[in-house]
């Protein structure tokens, strides 16, 4: 079992786009893959046309009454499973606080699934807030991918996430495997090139070699309720996410 969390506190950096298309790229390679939407905005599921009829049919069912994950999985047209989110998820922080039991729920749920399906891969689209939901993801995952658009504010946000991950490492007592992924990259723009240099200086070998270029097809695909591979399989966006998956597999990240 491999669990990958996609996390950033800044909007507009391609967090959900990355989570959806990484999960789709895994499914295309024949891996049994499920995406879990931990963001109360529920954009992961809606991006591919999947919603929860009620809070209990979403990942909220796990937090509310320890419902087994397999009961909430819906199949998408791309071949991956999806556990959608729901607006009820916005209550989780207030209801459950930040004790160990609250932030270990997802980890226990995934381990229970692993007992019966050890080859399953999971991609977590995190809440953009450092709270119960994102901590559940980080405590349960094997690695974190931090997408950041090619601008200075995004780099600053990623540096803050680096501090957060280092603080959590003291609790977990191990290094959190992570990769920083530049999105909306345009090699013609000096800003993009400068931000890449800044990222490499700040995060070193943790920066993905693959860059996700600015691509209109990536913006269009959610409107069609499709992954980039379904909407425009020959587009630059599809090629970039396919290359990213090749890199992550080759590096042993997945």
Predicted feature descriptions by range:
Residues 1-254:
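P-loop NTP-binding core
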């Amino acid at each position: 079992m491999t669990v990958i969390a996609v996390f950033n506190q800044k909007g507009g950096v391609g967090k959900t786009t990355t989570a959806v298309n990484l999960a789709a790229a895994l499914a295309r390679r024949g891996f049994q893959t499920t995406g879990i939407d931990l963001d109360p905005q529920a954009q992961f599921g809606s991006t591919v046309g999947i919603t929860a009829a009620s809070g209990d049919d979403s990942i909220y069912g796990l937090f509310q009454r320890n419902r087994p994950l397999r009961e909430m999985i819906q199949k998408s047209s791309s071949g991956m499973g999806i556990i959608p989110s729901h607006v009820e998820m916005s209550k989780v922080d207030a209801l459950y606080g930040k004790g160990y039991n609250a932030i270990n729920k997802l980890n226990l749920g995934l381990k229970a699934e692993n007992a019966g399906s050890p080859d399953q891969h999971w991609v977590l689209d995190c809440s953009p807030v450092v709270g119960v939901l994102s901590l559940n993801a980080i405590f349960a995952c094997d690695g974190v991918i931090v997408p950041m658009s090619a601008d200075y504010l995004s780099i600053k946000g990623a540096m803050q996430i680096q501090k957060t991950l280092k603080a959590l490492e003291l609790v977990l007592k191990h290094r959190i495997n992570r990769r920083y992924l530049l999105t909306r990259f345009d090699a013609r723009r000096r800003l993009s090139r400068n931000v890449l240099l800044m990222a490499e200086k700040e995060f070193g070998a943790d920066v993905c070699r693959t860059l996700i270029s600015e691509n209109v097809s990536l913006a269009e695909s959610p409107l069609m309720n499709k992954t980039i591979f379904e909407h425009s399989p020959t587009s630059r966006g599809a090629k970039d996410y396919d290359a990213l998956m090749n890199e992550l597999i080759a590096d042993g990240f997945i």
